[in-house]
């Protein structure tokens, strides 16, 4: 199924690598990791982002926007999946006969000699990767989100072992060289990449699992339930005595796992206990049980995943959930958190759908996912993520929520302003607000745009 890339990164020391789309979370992670390995990094993107600012602070030269003049005899060009053949920098690299790699192809070179704990699934992979990196602090880590433990999406280590968040959206997880394949779920998404062929989609997961020496799976998933090869298996019944507490004002889940005793992990919800359990089971051959138990406490959450931005008169949470399953699970966590805080405030949801294709593919589930634990729904325009706009009558589809439609939300001090046509139509000064989406809602809620 895999074709080995014709261009391989060999000696990284002083290798000149240019990243097109360097601001993306996946590409920026590779750029940080390779810079730490001794490579000379440059890059470009269409706009300034936190990742771009971070890399510039490290001394990386970055062009905004893309500029063919930035291509000047680098050893290799690596580009994100969203970059097309007609990109000016791609065209210039071809003129200069500089090797060009997609992120997917570059992964093969970067990971082929590593002992990779590769985490992949529709939901929970960032959290599991960050939890496992907390449990195994001597491992390197490349995560698709910022771990609050070390305030980055990358942790460099001389150790051959690496915790890696793999990506099924472009099938690049197949290039991650898994020593251990860790899969919490396989709910179909990104089917456009697989030609809307479910058989092809599930075959990719099977290939990923089959080519790992070690497999850790959650058998409540319909596909994983039928997986027949040797694996470390987690089932719902293996996790019990789940309780939720506030510790020093922070939310934690305590639970017992199989016959391994009790564990405590930052965050709330059954899904949080499941994610932590998969990380624990993945590490059993790496450390003793007490080290695992203690190191898990170093996990402090990840940016944009139940990210508590403030907790005063207005409790404000930012969450990356952009699929109905994720939204439903996180809303349950929000209700648990509200109960722990003993607040009587309504839970207000601000939702920014991410991609027209995802919204249309999951429309019926989106229409149901706010039914529990959402007292008021506020809807932002769809974040297209470069997709062509489609006409979707959200007012009709979501009328059963009596939603409020706005153009954007603006953080002003400790308050939130709701805007339509650049006019403030409402100010939220107190209450419990959670924002959902993988687009720019995170910057709106943080007052960064």
Curated annotation (Swiss-Prot):
The keyword ATP-binding applies. Coiled coil: none annotated. It holds the Pfam family Mur_ligase. Its EC number is 6.3.2.8. It is found in: Cytoplasm. Pathway: Cell wall biogenesis; peptidoglycan biosynthesis. It catalyses: UDP-N-acetyl-alpha-D-muramate + L-alanine + ATP = UDP-N-acetyl-alpha-D-muramoyl-L-alanine + ADP + phosphate + H(+). One of its GO terms (biological process) is cell division. InterPro entries: Mur-like_cat_sf, Mur_ligase_C, Mur_ligase_C_dom_sf, Mur_ligase_cen, Mur_ligase_N, MurCDEF_pg_biosynth, UDP-N-AcMur_Ala_ligase_MurC. GO terms for cellular component: cytoplasm. Keywords: ATP-binding, Cell cycle, Cell division, Cell shape, Cell wall biogenesis/degradation, Cytoplasm, Ligase, Nucleotide-binding, Peptidoglycan synthesis. Belongs to the MurCDEF family. Cell wall formation. This is UDP-N-acetylmuramate--L-alanine ligase.
């Amino acid at each position: 199924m895999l074709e080995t890339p014709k261009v391989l990164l060999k000696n990284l020391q002083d290798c000149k690598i240019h990243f097109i789309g360097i601001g993306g979370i996946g590409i920026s992670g590779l750029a940080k990791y390779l810079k730490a390995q001794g490579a000379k990094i440059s890059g470009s993107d269409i706009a300034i982002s936190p990742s771009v600012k971070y890399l510039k602070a490290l001394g990386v030269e970055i062009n905004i926007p893309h500029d063919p003049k930035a291509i000047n005899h680098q050893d290799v060009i690596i580009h994100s999946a969203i970059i097309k053949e007609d990109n000016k920098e791609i065209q210039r690299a071809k003129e200069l006969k500089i090797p060009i790699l997609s992120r997917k192809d570059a992964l093969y070179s970067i990971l082929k000699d590593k002992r990779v704990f590769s985490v992949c699934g529709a939901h929970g992979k960032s959290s599991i990767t960050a939890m496992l990196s907390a449990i195994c602090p001597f491992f390197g880590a490349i995560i698709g989100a910022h771990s609050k433990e070390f305030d980055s999406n990358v942790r460099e280590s001389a150790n051959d072992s690496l915790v890696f968040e793999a990506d099924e959206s472009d099938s690049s997880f197949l290039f991650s060289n898994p020593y251990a394949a860790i899969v919490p779920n396989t709910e179909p998404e990104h089917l456009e990449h697989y030609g809307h062929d479910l058989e092809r989609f599930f075959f990719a997961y099977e290939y990923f699992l089959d080519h790992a020496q070690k497999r850790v799976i959650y058998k409540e998933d319909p596909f994983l339930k039928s997986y027949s090869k040797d694996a470390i298996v987690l089932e719902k019944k293996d996790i019990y005595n789940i309780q939720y507490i506030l510790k020093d004002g922070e939310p934690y889940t305590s639970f017992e796992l199989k016959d391994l005793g009790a564990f405590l992990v930052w965050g709330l919800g059954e899904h949080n206990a499941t994610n932590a359990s998969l990380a624990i089971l993945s590490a059993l051959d790496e450390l003793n049980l007490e080290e695992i138990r203690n190191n898990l406490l170093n996990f402090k959450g990840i940016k944009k995943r139940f990210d508590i931005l403030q907790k005063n008169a207005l409790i404000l949470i930012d969450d990356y959930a952009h699929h109905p399953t994720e939204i439903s699970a996180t809303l349950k966590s929000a209700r648990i958190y509200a109960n722990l805080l003993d607040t009587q405030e309504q839970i207000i949801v601000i939702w920014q759908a991410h991609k027209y294709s995802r919204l249309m593919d999951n429309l019926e589930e989106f229409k149901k996912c706010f039914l529990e634990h959402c007292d008021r729904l506020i809807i932002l325009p769809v974040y297209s993520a470069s997709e062509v706009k489609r006409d979707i009558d959200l007012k009709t589809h979501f009328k059963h929520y009596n939603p409020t439609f706005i153009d954007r939300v603006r953080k002003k001090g400790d308050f939130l302003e709701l805007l339509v046509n650049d006019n403030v139509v409402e100010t939220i000064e107190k209450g419990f607000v959670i924002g959902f989406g993988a687009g720019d809602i995170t910057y709106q809620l943080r007052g960064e745009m």
